[in-house]
Protein backbone atom coordinates (compact mmCIF):
# COMPACT_ATOMS: atom_id res chain seq x y z
CA UNK A 1 0.00 0.00 0.00
CA UNK A 2 1.43 3.37 -1.06
CA UNK A 3 0.52 6.86 0.11
CA UNK A 4 0.70 9.76 -2.35
CA UNK A 5 0.00 13.49 -2.42
CA UNK A 6 -0.47 15.36 -5.70
CA UNK A 7 -0.48 19.08 -6.38
CA UNK A 8 -2.88 21.30 -8.33
CA UNK A 9 -4.44 19.44 -11.28
CA UNK A 10 -6.63 22.35 -12.45
CA UNK A 11 -8.56 20.47 -15.09
CA UNK A 12 -5.52 18.85 -16.73
CA UNK A 13 -7.00 15.37 -16.85
CA UNK A 14 -4.61 14.02 -19.49
CA UNK A 15 -1.67 14.81 -17.20
CA UNK A 16 -3.55 13.34 -14.24
CA UNK A 17 -4.15 10.11 -16.15
CA UNK A 18 -0.48 9.92 -17.18
CA UNK A 19 0.66 10.55 -13.61
CA UNK A 20 -1.54 7.75 -12.27
CA UNK A 21 -0.07 5.43 -14.90
CA UNK A 22 3.49 6.57 -14.13
CA UNK A 23 3.17 5.78 -10.42
CA UNK A 24 1.25 2.56 -11.10
CA UNK A 25 -1.62 3.74 -8.94
CA UNK A 26 -3.87 0.94 -7.70
CA UNK A 27 -7.20 2.07 -6.20
CA UNK A 28 -7.49 -1.19 -4.29
CA UNK A 29 -4.08 -0.78 -2.69
CA UNK A 30 -3.01 2.88 -2.73
CA UNK A 31 -4.31 6.21 -1.43
CA UNK A 32 -3.89 9.54 -3.23
CA UNK A 33 -4.51 12.90 -1.55
CA UNK A 34 -5.19 15.78 -3.96
CA UNK A 35 -4.20 19.13 -2.46
CA UNK A 36 -7.02 21.21 -3.93
CA UNK A 37 -7.70 23.03 -7.20
CA UNK A 38 -8.91 19.98 -9.04
CA UNK A 39 -10.62 22.23 -11.58
CA UNK A 40 -10.38 25.39 -13.70
CA UNK A 41 -7.93 26.92 -16.19
CA UNK A 42 -7.20 23.52 -17.72
CA UNK A 43 -9.31 21.98 -20.52
CA UNK A 44 -10.97 18.98 -18.83
CA UNK A 45 -12.25 19.87 -15.37
CA UNK A 46 -15.29 17.59 -15.59
CA UNK A 47 -13.09 14.63 -16.51
CA UNK A 48 -10.90 15.23 -13.44
CA UNK A 49 -13.93 15.20 -11.14
CA UNK A 50 -15.40 12.11 -12.79
CA UNK A 51 -12.08 10.29 -12.49
CA UNK A 52 -11.81 11.12 -8.79
CA UNK A 53 -15.41 10.08 -8.13
CA UNK A 54 -14.90 6.80 -10.01
CA UNK A 55 -11.76 5.99 -8.02
CA UNK A 56 -13.79 6.19 -4.81
CA UNK A 57 -12.15 6.37 -1.41
CA UNK A 58 -8.68 5.78 -2.86
CA UNK A 59 -8.64 9.45 -3.96
CA UNK A 60 -9.16 11.98 -1.16
CA UNK A 61 -9.21 15.63 -2.23
CA UNK A 62 -9.13 18.95 -0.46
CA UNK A 63 -10.96 22.08 -1.53
CA UNK A 64 -8.90 24.83 -3.13
CA UNK A 65 -9.85 28.34 -4.16
CA UNK A 66 -10.77 27.25 -7.70
CA UNK A 67 -12.99 24.49 -6.37
CA UNK A 68 -14.82 26.96 -4.14
CA UNK A 69 -15.11 29.32 -7.10
CA UNK A 70 -16.75 26.55 -9.12
CA UNK A 71 -19.32 26.02 -6.38
CA UNK A 72 -20.03 29.75 -6.20
CA UNK A 73 -20.41 30.00 -9.99
CA UNK A 74 -22.60 26.89 -10.16
CA UNK A 75 -25.01 28.09 -7.50
CA UNK A 76 -25.33 31.61 -8.86
CA UNK A 77 -23.42 33.49 -6.20
CA UNK A 78 -20.43 34.42 -8.38
CA UNK A 79 -20.17 35.15 -12.10
CA UNK A 80 -17.61 33.06 -13.99
CA UNK A 81 -14.64 35.05 -15.29
CA UNK A 82 -13.42 35.02 -18.88
CA UNK A 83 -10.45 32.89 -17.83
CA UNK A 84 -12.60 30.16 -16.30
CA UNK A 85 -12.87 26.78 -18.02
CA UNK A 86 -15.79 25.40 -16.06
CA UNK A 87 -18.49 25.06 -18.71
CA UNK A 88 -17.92 21.34 -19.17
CA UNK A 89 -19.05 20.94 -15.56
CA UNK A 90 -21.76 23.60 -15.48
CA UNK A 91 -23.46 22.19 -18.60
CA UNK A 92 -22.89 18.49 -17.86
CA UNK A 93 -25.81 16.08 -17.39
CA UNK A 94 -24.08 14.79 -14.22
CA UNK A 95 -23.39 18.32 -12.99
CA UNK A 96 -25.36 17.88 -9.75
CA UNK A 97 -23.53 14.68 -8.82
CA UNK A 98 -20.13 16.32 -9.35
CA UNK A 99 -21.03 19.48 -7.44
CA UNK A 100 -22.54 17.57 -4.53
CA UNK A 101 -19.45 15.39 -4.28
CA UNK A 102 -17.17 18.44 -4.37
CA UNK A 103 -19.22 20.32 -1.77
CA UNK A 104 -18.64 17.52 0.73
CA UNK A 105 -14.84 17.54 0.52
CA UNK A 106 -12.79 19.00 3.41
CA UNK A 107 -10.48 22.00 3.52
CA UNK A 108 -7.82 20.23 5.59
CA UNK A 109 -6.83 16.65 6.26
CA UNK A 110 -4.40 14.88 8.56
CA UNK A 111 -3.05 11.38 8.17
CA UNK A 112 -0.84 9.40 10.54
CA UNK A 113 1.85 7.52 8.64
CA UNK A 114 5.02 5.80 9.71
CA UNK A 115 5.00 7.27 13.19
CA UNK A 116 4.35 10.87 12.13
CA UNK A 117 1.51 13.19 11.20
CA UNK A 118 1.04 14.79 7.79
CA UNK A 119 -1.21 17.87 7.67
CA UNK A 120 -2.59 18.77 4.24
CA UNK A 121 -4.09 22.06 3.08
CA UNK A 122 -4.42 23.79 -0.26
CA UNK A 123 -2.63 27.08 0.44
CA UNK A 124 -1.34 27.62 3.96
CA UNK A 125 -1.74 27.56 7.72
CA UNK A 126 -1.70 30.70 9.82
CA UNK A 127 1.26 30.86 12.22
CA UNK A 128 -1.09 31.25 15.21
CA UNK A 129 -2.78 27.89 14.57
CA UNK A 130 -1.82 24.46 15.82
CA UNK A 131 -2.52 21.41 13.66
CA UNK A 132 -5.51 20.56 15.82
CA UNK A 133 -6.88 24.09 15.54
CA UNK A 134 -6.37 24.05 11.76
CA UNK A 135 -8.52 20.95 11.45
CA UNK A 136 -11.14 22.33 13.83
CA UNK A 137 -11.39 25.67 12.02
CA UNK A 138 -11.56 23.91 8.65
CA UNK A 139 -14.39 21.85 10.10
CA UNK A 140 -16.36 25.00 10.89
CA UNK A 141 -16.36 25.95 7.21
CA UNK A 142 -17.05 22.39 6.10
CA UNK A 143 -20.12 22.25 8.33
CA UNK A 144 -21.58 25.32 6.61
CA UNK A 145 -20.65 24.14 3.11
CA UNK A 146 -22.39 20.84 3.74
CA UNK A 147 -25.50 22.44 5.22
CA UNK A 148 -28.62 23.84 3.59
CA UNK A 149 -27.20 27.35 4.07
CA UNK A 150 -24.20 26.74 1.81
CA UNK A 151 -25.34 29.05 -1.02
CA UNK A 152 -25.66 31.99 1.33
CA UNK A 153 -22.18 31.33 2.66
CA UNK A 154 -20.72 31.17 -0.85
CA UNK A 155 -22.20 34.59 -1.55
CA UNK A 156 -20.49 36.09 1.50
CA UNK A 157 -17.24 34.13 1.26
CA UNK A 158 -15.33 36.52 -0.98
CA UNK A 159 -13.28 39.41 0.37
CA UNK A 160 -9.88 40.26 1.82
CA UNK A 161 -11.08 41.52 5.18
CA UNK A 162 -10.48 40.69 7.95
CA UNK A 163 -6.89 39.78 7.11
CA UNK A 164 -5.79 38.90 10.65
CA UNK A 165 -7.03 35.99 12.74
CA UNK A 166 -8.56 36.42 16.15
CA UNK A 167 -10.32 33.67 18.09
CA UNK A 168 -12.97 36.26 18.93
CA UNK A 169 -14.04 36.57 15.29
CA UNK A 170 -17.57 35.35 14.64
CA UNK A 171 -19.94 34.69 11.76
CA UNK A 172 -18.94 35.51 8.20
CA UNK A 173 -15.73 37.31 9.22
CA UNK A 174 -14.50 34.24 11.05
CA UNK A 175 -15.30 31.84 8.22
CA UNK A 176 -13.78 34.15 5.60
CA UNK A 177 -10.46 34.33 7.44
CA UNK A 178 -10.39 30.54 7.69
CA UNK A 179 -11.16 30.10 3.99
CA UNK A 180 -8.61 32.71 2.93
CA UNK A 181 -5.85 31.16 5.02
CA UNK A 182 -6.48 27.62 3.86
CA UNK A 183 -7.14 28.34 0.17
CA UNK A 184 -5.55 31.70 -0.79
CA UNK A 185 -2.63 32.67 1.45
CA UNK A 186 0.97 32.79 0.25
CA UNK A 187 2.60 35.60 2.21
CA UNK A 188 1.81 37.08 5.60
CA UNK A 189 3.38 39.51 8.02
CA UNK A 190 5.47 38.10 10.87
CA UNK A 191 2.36 38.59 13.03
CA UNK A 192 0.19 36.57 10.64
CA UNK A 193 -1.60 39.35 8.73
CA UNK A 194 -2.41 37.86 5.33
CA UNK A 195 -1.47 39.39 1.98
CA UNK A 196 -3.53 38.60 -1.12
CA UNK A 197 -1.79 40.74 -3.75
CA UNK A 198 1.64 39.15 -4.07
CA UNK A 199 2.16 36.00 -6.14
CA UNK A 200 5.96 36.08 -6.37
CA UNK A 201 8.16 33.18 -5.39
CA UNK A 202 9.19 32.83 -1.77
CA UNK A 203 12.63 34.29 -2.51
CA UNK A 204 11.00 37.53 -3.73
CA UNK A 205 8.89 38.32 -0.68
CA UNK A 206 7.62 41.92 -0.65
CA UNK A 207 8.89 44.19 2.14
CA UNK A 208 7.37 43.35 5.51
CA UNK A 209 6.09 39.95 4.38
CA UNK A 210 7.33 36.38 4.69
CA UNK A 211 6.13 33.11 3.16
CA UNK A 212 3.52 31.77 5.56
CA UNK A 213 5.69 28.75 6.35
CA UNK A 214 8.59 31.00 7.43
CA UNK A 215 6.57 33.13 9.85
CA UNK A 216 8.40 33.30 13.19
CA UNK A 217 6.88 31.21 15.94
CA UNK A 218 4.72 29.14 13.59
CA UNK A 219 2.94 26.67 15.84
CA UNK A 220 2.89 23.86 13.25
CA UNK A 221 6.68 23.88 12.86
CA UNK A 222 6.97 20.30 14.11
CA UNK A 223 4.24 18.96 11.82
CA UNK A 224 4.95 18.18 8.17
CA UNK A 225 2.56 20.23 6.01
CA UNK A 226 1.86 19.42 2.35
CA UNK A 227 0.28 22.17 0.24
CA UNK A 228 -0.23 23.38 -3.33
CA UNK A 229 -1.54 26.70 -4.68
CA UNK A 230 1.80 28.46 -5.23
CA UNK A 231 2.99 27.72 -8.77
CA UNK A 232 5.69 30.43 -8.72
CA UNK A 233 7.16 28.73 -5.67
CA UNK A 234 7.36 25.41 -7.47
CA UNK A 235 8.58 22.19 -5.91
CA UNK A 236 9.60 22.66 -2.28
CA UNK A 237 10.81 19.79 -0.12
CA UNK A 238 11.90 20.70 3.41
CA UNK A 239 11.75 18.86 6.69
CA UNK A 240 8.66 20.84 7.70
CA UNK A 241 6.84 21.66 4.43
CA UNK A 242 6.16 20.13 1.02
CA UNK A 243 5.05 22.44 -1.80
CA UNK A 244 3.57 20.48 -4.70
CA UNK A 245 2.14 23.03 -7.15
CA UNK A 246 4.58 22.85 -10.05
CA UNK A 247 2.48 24.75 -12.57
CA UNK A 248 0.84 21.97 -14.56
CA UNK A 249 -1.67 24.30 -16.20
CA UNK A 250 1.09 26.80 -17.09
CA UNK A 251 3.21 24.27 -18.98
CA UNK A 252 5.19 23.01 -15.99
CA UNK A 253 4.56 19.56 -14.60
CA UNK A 254 2.11 17.71 -12.41
CA UNK A 255 3.95 16.52 -9.31
CA UNK A 256 3.22 13.94 -6.67
CA UNK A 257 5.17 12.66 -3.70
CA UNK A 258 5.26 9.02 -2.68
CA UNK A 259 5.83 8.26 0.98
CA UNK A 260 7.70 5.15 2.02
CA UNK A 261 7.71 3.57 5.44
CA UNK A 262 7.99 7.00 7.09
CA UNK A 263 7.11 10.57 6.09
CA UNK A 264 10.83 11.36 5.79
CA UNK A 265 11.19 8.53 3.28
CA UNK A 266 9.69 10.16 0.21
CA UNK A 267 10.30 10.61 -3.49
CA UNK A 268 8.96 12.92 -6.16
CA UNK A 269 7.08 11.63 -9.20
CA UNK A 270 6.02 13.96 -12.02
CA UNK A 271 4.88 14.20 -15.62
CA UNK A 272 5.46 17.08 -18.02
CA UNK A 273 2.41 19.12 -19.03
CA UNK A 274 1.56 21.11 -22.17
CA UNK A 275 0.69 24.74 -21.52
CA UNK A 276 -3.09 25.04 -21.15
CA UNK A 277 -3.26 28.66 -20.01
CA UNK A 278 -1.18 31.76 -20.74
CA UNK A 279 -0.27 33.92 -17.73
CA UNK A 280 -2.37 37.08 -17.85
CA UNK A 281 -4.67 35.67 -20.55
From Swiss-Prot:
Its EC number is 3.6.1.41. It is an enzyme of class 3 (hydrolase). GO terms for molecular function: bis(5'-nucleosyl)-tetraphosphatase (symmetrical) activity. CDD domains: MPP_ApaH. It comes from the Bacteria. It catalyses: P(1),P(4)-bis(5'-adenosyl) tetraphosphate + H2O = 2 ADP + 2 H(+). SUPFAM superfamilies: Metallo-dependent phosphatases. Pfam families: Metallophos. Keywords: Hydrolase. Belongs to the Ap4A hydrolase family. Hydrolyzes diadenosine 5',5'''-P1,P4-tetraphosphate to yield ADP. HAMAP family: ApaH (MF_00199). PANTHER family: CYTOCHROME C5 (PTHR40942:SF4), PTHR40942. This is Bis(5'-nucleosyl)-tetraphosphatase, symmetrical. It comes from Acidovorax ebreus (strain TPSY). The gene is apaH.
